[in-house]
UniProtKB/Swiss-Prot annotation:
InterPro entries: LolA/LolB/LppX (IPR029046), OM_lipoprot_carrier_LolA-like (IPR004564), OM_lipoprot_carrier_LolA_Pbac (IPR018323). It is found in: Periplasm. Keywords: Chaperone, Periplasm, Protein transport, Signal, Transport. This is Outer-membrane lipoprotein carrier protein.
Length: 209
């Protein structure tokens, strides 16, 4: 009986590893050809019960390796920029800019999948390709391997090989959804777009690495 249990566990483990490898390969295949990504987005945060807690719109730009620009519009205006080494977070309402080192935890932020190293997906996430939810849509469910992750699960959805949404859940059961429109892939983006010029008269907070 113990042998049968051990064999069952081994078989399930092997099947899980094969599913993860297949998911990683499929997801990497979709992401590896994306050198730049520009889009408008709508971000909605919901409570565990489904109540809308926050909704913002904005634009993002991403360029490999490691360059990212994110700006939300009023009334919750904020700009986040990284050059791959440090991050600038600008809150106009507070007249404040926070500058911090791009730590491993921050580099695992979901949106940074668009500018990070595709080859590291397998190191950072367990990846499972989901059954087709609707014709032409491909979904992947990612679970972070790190214990200090900012989220528990992340779903990436593609239509016609193009990323259309991200949905993540945290440990409190809250869900944040990102839906992309006006997507442009592999268009030229100057690296100047990923360096933040600090406005005059704002407070600057530099966090230690």
């Amino acid at each position: 009986m113990k042998l049968l249990k051990l064999l069952s566990v081994a078989a399930l483990s092997a099947a899980s590893m094969m599913a993860n490898a297949a998911g990683v390969d499929a997801l990497s295949g979709l992401l590896k050809n994306v050198e730049t990504f520009t889009a408008n987005f709508t971000q909605t945060m919901r409570s565990q019960s489904g109540q809308v807690l926050q909704e913002v719109t904005g634009t993002l730009k991403a360029k490999r390796p490691g360059l990212f620009f994110w700006k939300t519009r009023a009334p919750l205006e904020q700009t986040i920029v990284t050059d791959g080494q440090q991050v600038w977070i600008y809150d106009p309402d507070l007249e404040q800019v926070t500058i911090q080192h791009l730590s491993q935890q921050l580099s695992n932020t979901p949106a940074l999948l668009l500018s990070g190293e595709v080859g590291k997906i397998d190191e950072q996430y367990q990846v499972e390709q989901q059954p087709e939810s609707q014709p032409g849509q491909v979904d992947f469910l990612l679970r972070p391997k790190g214990v200090d992750s900012l989220f528990d699960t992340l779903q990436l959805s593609f239509v016609n090989d193009q990323l259309v949404s991200m949905k993540l859940k945290d440990s409190l059961g809250q869900q944040t959804s990102l839906f992309f429109t006006a997507v442009s892939v592999n268009q030229t983006i100057s690296e100047k777009a990923f360096h933040f010029e600090i406005p005059d008269g704002v407070d600057v907070i530099r966090e230690a690495p």
